[in-house]
């Protein structure tokens, strides 16, 4: 009986898909941006690994925007800067929706994960809550905490440079746990709760990979008994964890002992914000998911670039010596006088973008671009990797050149941008906290050390994880101190 039900459901779904695909092929082929040919029914085969690199190759063949088909799904991939501005920025009102994500959002997240929440009132509610705590004026209040943890990061690299990537993860986790839950002590990346959170993030990233679950192409499979039961188990495990963390803050608030945090803000304003307990837990968890993973990866990329491009590193250090000297450590107050540091960070964002493949948008209305039509309902991917390699905007894009971000007066250019934090109304709300982290860590670590590669084990700058947010695979560095009495100046704050 069960087999008959499953067979009937699949047959109905395939018949519906066949009719829909044939209809789409007749009505849309002439107007869509070009793309590689695919199977008449199933469309294009999803890339098996590193989709952003595969899509970048297709950009070279088919142009700034190309079209793929996965069953009934139409996916338009953007690989050039101006096309991204035209479609995802200027048409933000029509392209800020998210495609339906059955596996990762509906099954794994109960529809509460802000990253995948469709455009509408719920998304506005979530973003209002996030913006209230992460806007520039609020983000500035985190600088003392970020500075303390950045000094710990430098001291960790001084004492144990071999595990520099781990120290970057520890920095990121400590900052994010402080912002999200008010934790005031450094957070080890081996803490049980952090390990559980990262396990959940890895599961989410796997579910978001193109073609990972057939249910995203044929949503009717969601209703097949037993289908994707492991995803439902993942959901319950994650919800139990983030609810436990939120409840711990509730208990501290009840005692009058809770330090300021995003979770405390949500609890105190829960009724006004109109959010349920589950929504509150997911919003708090989103801070860790969005901030820890990406910041840790960006710190690894920053040190990789410093080691691989010693001349660029030396330019930053020359300005640090001129502005700061070696008798004190740089601080946030020096930022306006250190454009070389900012340029180095901006180039690291571009050179190896953390969200390399970007996250899918969905058109709610037809979007006309250069004579082509991206139809309502189509998915739109801004491929950060390909956009970052647009030779018209970033000449010699494979080279690491922080100087491209500076004008003739040595100040940061206003006419050059890289959209590394997302597009339009989907831009990352936490970008100001992230920028603060990258600036102060870059300033401190390049002030403190001359970073170089291990001659016996040169760095492969293309060796990254195949995940939604990419991380450098382990690589060796030498941290040669540039400053005497570093510990005395920074203070022995490592715990």
UniProtKB/Swiss-Prot annotation:
Q: Which Pfam families does the record match to this protein? A: p450 (PF00067)
Transmembrane region(s): 2-22
Q: Record's Gene Ontology CC terms?
A: membrane
On the tree of life, the source organism's domain of life is Eukaryota
PROSITE patterns reported in the protein's UniProt record: CYTOCHROME_P450 (PS00086)
Pathway-wise, it operates in: Secondary metabolite biosynthesis
Membrane topology per record: Single-pass membrane protein
Function of the protein: Cytochrome P450 monooxygenase that is able to use 4-ethoxybenzoic acid as a substrate for oxidation.
Question: Would you identify the family this protein belongs to, as annotated?
Answer: Belongs to the cytochrome P450 family.
Q: What is this protein called?
A: Cytochrome P450 monooxygenase 64
Protein species of origin: Postia placenta (strain ATCC 44394 / Madison 698-R)
Q: What is the lineage of its organism?
A: Eukaryota, Fungi, Dikarya, Basidiomycota, Agaricomycotina
